[in-house]
């Protein structure tokens, strides 16, 4: 599996949160595609 994106935490900037959520969505897509 690809590495799971790091959660930037409570004090992250909006840009960091957006980047994290985008990376997380991409990660989930990769993992679910491999499983099914």
Swiss-Prot record:
Keyword Manganese assigned: no
UniProtKB keywords: Amidation, Hormone, Secreted
CDD domains to which the protein is assigned, alphabetical: PAH (cd00126)
Modified residues (Tyrosine amide): 36
Chief location bin: secreted
Ranges in coiled-coil conformation: none
Stretch forming the signal peptide: none
Keyword match Kinase: no
Family note: Belongs to the NPY family.
Protein's recorded name: Peptide YY-like
């Amino acid at each position: 599996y690809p590495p799971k994106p790091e959660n930037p935490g409570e004090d992250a900037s909006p840009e960091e949160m957006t980047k994290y959520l985008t990376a997380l969505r991409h990660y989930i897509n990769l993992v679910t595609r491999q499983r099914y």
